[in-house]
């Protein structure tokens, strides 16, 4: 059976791995997932990720989770726009997460970026997820 929400699956793997204090989790590779992980790494929510290619043409992303004093840096990670209900926002209506302490990740015409970058570049888009 085909996966209906690959990004939601990746976020769930990160959430479950952090809850079980795993050092890393893996997920099937895609360009969108890699761009979201780029934003998470730039914002300091994960240590990094690497792409592992298999001989059959498939690839996986190994995500290194980040912890501070034994607790996960990611307290909450949630999908906002889902396959059954897409959420689009203009630059004026980009929400703040946890009063500015968290981030929202958007898919914009200029690429996948964090909410503060979208405000700087004056661009809206699809709200992919929120992280705190």
Curated annotation (Swiss-Prot):
Q: Which UniProt keywords apply?
A: Ribonucleoprotein, Ribosomal protein, RNA-binding, rRNA-binding
* GO terms for MF: rRNA binding; structural constituent of ribosome
GO biological process terms, alphabetically, are: translation
What InterPro entries does UniProt report for this protein, alphabetically?
Ribosomal_uS8 (IPR000630), Ribosomal_uS8_CS (IPR047863), Ribosomal_uS8_sf (IPR035987)
Gene3D superfamilies found in the cross-reference section: 3.30.1370.30, 3.30.1490.10
Cellular-component GO terms for this entry: ribonucleoprotein complex; ribosome
Pfam families (UniProt xref): Ribosomal_S8 (PF00410)
**In UniProt terms, what function does this protein have?**
One of the primary rRNA binding proteins, it binds directly to 16S rRNA central domain where it helps coordinate assembly of the platform of the 30S subunit.
Family affiliation = Belongs to the universal ribosomal protein uS8 family.
NCBIfam families to which the protein is assigned, alphabetical: PRK00136.1
Assembly and oligomerization: Part of the 30S ribosomal subunit. Contacts proteins S5 and S12.
Listed name of the protein: Small ribosomal subunit protein uS8
- Say which species the protein is native to: Sinorhizobium fredii (strain NBRC 101917 / NGR234)
Q: Which gene encodes it?
A: rpsH
């Amino acid at each position: 059976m085909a996966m209906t929400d690959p990004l939601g699956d990746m976020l769930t793997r990160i959430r479950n791995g952090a809850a079980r204090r795993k050092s890393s989790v893996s997920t099937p590779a895609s360009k969108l997932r890699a761009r979201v992980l780029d934003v998470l790494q730039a914002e300091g929510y994960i240590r990094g990720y690497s792409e592992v290619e298999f001989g059959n043409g498939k690839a996986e992303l190994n995500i290194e989770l980040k912890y501070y004093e034994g607790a996960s840096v990611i307290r909450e990670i949630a999908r906002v726009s889902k396959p059954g209900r897409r959420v689009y926002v203009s630059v004026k209506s980009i929400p703040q997460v946890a009063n500015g302490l968290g981030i929202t990740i958007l898919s914009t015409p200029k690429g996948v970026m964090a909410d503060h970058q979208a405000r700087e570049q004056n661009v809206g888009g699809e709200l992919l997820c929120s992280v705190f």
